[in-house]
Amino acid sequence: AYQRQLLELRGLSLSAREHHAMTVSDFLVRGLCAAQDLSALTIPDIERYVALRSRELSRHSLQHVVGHLRSFLRFCRDQGVIERPLDAIETPRTHRGELPPQALEWSAVQALIRSIDVHSRAGYRDHCILHLMVHYGLRPSEVVALRTDSIDWDAAVLHVVQCKTRSDLFLPLAPQTLRILRRYLDRERLAHGTDHPELFLRARCPSGPIERWAIGDLFKKRVREAGIELPGHNVYRLRHTF
């Protein structure tokens, strides 16, 4: 019932619902005393669990866990499982500068994109993917969801399906981006045929759409080949540079 509420009332993505489920499952196993029922849950029980997780997680990650708990406890009260409001959990604060900066230096990102040999295996593809992430802030999940018909050439618009927010985004495309997309399609993508509607395909057999995890791999590969020093090789830093 709780998962259904997260989907139907809050519209959360599958990934977000899975994170909620992991927190709730762990709380029910480690947050409750043996044979304790949810109806007997107390604030000290919740505080002990949060203290336990605080020894395992960063404050940033703990914020998400506390948010999941609040949501679940509100649901339990609405359903009559618990009588008292127990969702007033203090959220751990994070401070500016506590986490590494998310954005990369613009000059380094530009150097990375320029360094890609488009004549190498999947060179046009990788150049196009990284260009879209840097200039339009696309997530890996949004990149792999793009199709050949996601591009409206006449209107110069890219249709992006946002998996995280379950919404559609229509992005105006700059002339440079249109040229990069057209070059990729003409010189590399169309050679793979029309069996798959996805815009970006695997470079090796078996033929098929590229997977989300592969976006991170190609980013690390291109950084390594470029010989550029970047503070961390997390591909999500590209979209935060946007």
Predicted features, each with a name:
Residues 1-242:
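Conserved catalytic core of the tyrosine transesterase superfamily
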